C-alpha cells in the first residue's frame, strides 16, 4: 500500500514508519509512506504557510498555494508510482472512522492524507482536491497529524501480510461488531486470580463458545449501543438470551 502525507510536521510520521506493525510493514515493503511539507513549496524567506481568514475571526488558515502545490506534488508522485490515490482530509467535520471504515479504506492501493493545522483549510481547496473527509472523533486536536497516524495504523492492519497471524484482524474488537473477549497469558495464577479453566481445557469448541459469550457480555456491559445495530447469529442470540436470563 502506498500512502502519501501532506503535513507541516513530517518528522512526526517516523513514529509510524519506524516502529511497530506499521514499521515492520514498511521494512517488508508492504507499506510505503512518503511525506510532503507545504513549507517546501513556499517562495518567501520566512517560508510562510498561514494566512488570515476572510471575514475576520480568531486564528489563521493554512495558506492556499503551498498546501495546494504539496497536494498536487503528492498526486503526481502517486501517479508516477502507478497509483491513482484518493485524497483524504483529516477533519472534525469528516465521517467518523471506525472498524468498517478502516477496512473499506484498506481496499485502496494508495491514499494521500492531508493533515491540517491552524483553524483549517480554504473550503475551495477541499472542494477541488479532496475526495473524502474523515474524523477520528468528536474532539479537536492541534493538527491532523495524530488523526492521520491513527488512520494509517487502523487501515494498514487489513493489508494482507502485515499482521503476524492471518486471523488477527478478523478477531480484533469490532471485527464482528462486538468488543473483543478477555485474553490471558502466563502465569496461570496472577495475584491469586486464576485463568478461566475453559481456556486450559484444550476443548476448542468450548473455548470458542466461551469467547463468543464473553464478547457479547462485555459489549452489553460497556457498549450496549453496538448491539442495537447488530444482526445477531442464532448462536449469538441464544448466548445473549442466556446472559440476560442470568442477570435477572
Curated annotation (Swiss-Prot):
Keyword Cell cycle among record annotations: no
Subcellular location per the Swiss-Prot or TrEMBL entry: Cytoplasm
MF (Gene Ontology): tRNA (guanine(37)-N1)-methyltransferase activity
Enzyme class label: transferase
EC number of this enzyme: 2.1.1.228
UniProt keyword DNA-binding present: no
One Gene Ontology term from the biological process aspect of the record: tRNA N1-guanine methylation
Keywords: Cytoplasm, Methyltransferase, S-adenosyl-L-methionine, Transferase, tRNA processing
Amino acids binding S-adenosyl-L-methionine: 116, 136-141
Family membership: Belongs to the RNA methyltransferase TrmD family.
Quaternary structure annotation from Swiss-Prot or TrEMBL: Homodimer.
Biological role stated in the UniProt entry: Specifically methylates guanosine-37 in various tRNAs.
Name this polypeptide is given: tRNA (guanine-N(1)-)-methyltransferase
